[in-house]
Regions:
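Compositionally biased, low-complexity flexible segments
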Residues: 1-27
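Non-catalytic alpha-helical scaffolds and adjoining flexible linkers that form interface surfaces
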Residues: 29-277
Length: 277
């Protein structure tokens, strides 16, 4: 969805980024009792955690199934067939078996190793880490299809790896669009409370931009250019975003981070590592 507007409509050619689509394998196999036993999907590895001496629990955001937590058996062994493919930032095609508590990964093939370019640069790495954490918390419910969030994450990781735009801008664009897809798009061009034009302030707890009359206590006064930058990032206007100044980028990043932390219950811990100035 990196090349789509938050409401799913395609914008003009300006700023649109194509989404690379890989055909997934055959659909799920169904047991006699109607439950899925074996299924195939493509996904992005969000995080991993150790399990026992040789296994890992792998959390993925997948194209068709949504958020999936599955066990990769023996993937920590040096002779594992696909252990290296199940690392964070990797775009993989996986086959899984439905278990009683956690699914089990039986096959994994790399589609795009985004991590190779991302981990080589600190700014890209911290931005991508914040993206993965955000994706997991925004989707939240396991096995609830979230195609738009999946496509958005894939496009953001690809763009980050290409290095065309500053990592901070790519991160803020992803955060704004992810929130918009989840239903939390901030008001930018009009007052979040009365709908009036030419807002003067920004209040995270009020839903974004606010006018002078509706402005609540605790709101801040961003520069008009900062509102413009946020709108450009949300809408995919990269020429305008790339032309922004350091002052407005810093102000934008602060507002986006505050807005995100307000709407996600536990916040995003990895945002503290991101260079914001």
């Amino acid at each position: 969805l990196w090349g789509l507007s938050p409401r799913g409509r395609r914008p003009g050619r300006r700023g649109a980024l194509r989404v690379w689509v890989h055909p997934v394998g055959p659909g799920p196999r169904i047991r006699d009792n109607g439950k899925v036993s074996l299924y195939r999907d493509e996904g992005v590895v969000l995080r991993t955690q150790k399990l026992g001496e040789a296994d890992r629990i792998v959390t993925l955001l997948t194209r068709r199934t949504g958020l999936v937590r599955a066990v990769g058996k023996g993937v920590r062994r040096t002779k594992s067939r696909f252990g290296a493919r199940l690392e964070p930032f990797s775009h993989v095609d996986v086959q899984l078996y439905t278990g009683r508590t956690l699914d089990v990964i039986t096959q994994a093939e790399t589609l795009r190793p985004y991590g190779e370019r991302i981990v080589a640069d600190y700014a890209r790495y911290t931005a991508a880490t914040a993206m993965l954490e955000t994706a997991e918390k925004v989707v939240a419910v396991e096995k609830d299809p979230a195609l738009r969030q999946f496509l958005l994450l894939i496009g953001a990781l690809r763009t980050l790896g290409e290095g065309v735009h500053e990592p901070r801008l790519v991160l803020d664009a992803y955060l704004l669009r992810s929130l918009a897809v989840a239903g939390y798009a901030p008001a930018l061009g009009e007052c979040a409370r009365c709908g009036g034009a030419e807002p003067r302030g920004f209040a995270v707890h009020a839903g974004g931009a606010v006018c002078g009359v509706c402005r609540p206590h605790g709101s801040v006064n961003p520069a008009p250019e900062t509102f413009g930058l946020m709108a450009a990032l949300l809408g995919g206007d990269w020429p305008a975003a790339d032309a922004s100044t350091e002052r407005h980028r810093s102000e934008c990043s602060g507002l986006v981070a505050a807005y995100l932390q307000w709407h996600l219950e536990n916040g995003i811990r990895s945002l503290r590592l991101v260079e914001r100035s």
